[in-house]
Amino acid sequence: MTAQQASAPAGPLLTLQDLAVSYRARRGPRAARQIRAVDGVSFSLGTGEILALVGESGCGKTSIVRAIARLEESAGGQVLFRGADITHARGSALRQLRRDIQVVFQDPFESLDPRLTAFDTVAESLLVHKIGDGKAGRREQVLTMLEQVGLHPAETIARRYPHQLSGGQRQRLVIAGAMVLSPDLVIADEPVSMLDVSLRAGILRLMLDLREKRGVSILFVTHDLSLAWVVADRVAVVYLGRIVEIGAADEIIRAPLHPYTRALVSVIPVPETTTTRRERILLRGEAPSASRIPAGCRFHPRCPLYRQLGEPERCRTEDPALAPSGNSEHTAACHFIKESD
């Protein structure tokens, strides 16, 4: 954990209470059914904190993001922002949220208008929200923001179009368009997955710098637990629409409780200089779709511990709730946490 992470101020900015998101199946025998993509998700995000949502593709991470940002209607539960219920925000309340909560999506090229220069891309955010002291004031804000996200010389970059920028520069430009509004919360949905490995570290450092200098809270969404370890204060592991483990990032990596988290941790590369070696845990098959969620513990068909314990009936029939194992801040949804220690 970095010094910046350790000094992150406490206090709830965002709270999810039993959030549910459903979609209607579009085809096949289940076409009339509602598919529950997110099912009873609860967590909080503190002011100035970075929380990572980690899980495989299709686990519900993006559905959570879209519900928070009011890009999707939720099917149940509540989303609280600064203590106010924004679950079904409309009108002026929704317009304010569009400024206070910014989303950075994984593909920067799709997020940018190819007809706009870098300057116009960032300035558009100010114009839409009627921010800035005239044309000269907005120009100064845009150029300052471009410099702050590492796009320099700003005067030169400002005149370029998206196709004239590298992948890393495009993602920095997207971040500049978000941060120029001084949001309280930035949701970064797989922000480096489309970038070369050589560019990822720079974007991750940028996010840490923005948190330190501007006090922004970040919800960092990724399928890669090793990236979450680098940037996050806490990690929430998501599987088939549920949080199966949540706790401090260092503790999740050092002592994972849930068998699914253990499998994710087992594939994190270990530096050659360390004497510690991890045995890679292989999971059976692919995660089921949200339309075919197993009864009981939804992870049990792929769970190594379930097989190791002789396939207990409880795993097949009872849905486990998040529960602590010693540390009340580190919880996991497993009937046999003690056996997994």
Model-derived segments and their meaning:
Residues P9-P12, R26-P29, A248-D341:
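Charged, flexible cofactor/metal-binding loops and thiol motifs
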Residues V180-D184:
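A short, proline-enriched helix->beta-strand linker immediately N-terminal to the Walker B motif
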Residues G28-A32, I86-Q102, V128, K135, ...:
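ABC ATPase NBD coupling module
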Residues D85, A136-T156, D209, V265-S266:
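Conserved ABC ATPase "signature" region
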Residues G77-D85:
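Conserved ABC transporter NBD signature motif
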Residues A69:
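Helix-to-loop junction immediately C-terminal to a conserved catalytic motif
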Residues E56, L195, L199-R278:
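P-loop NTP-binding/switch modules centered on Walker-like glycine-rich loops
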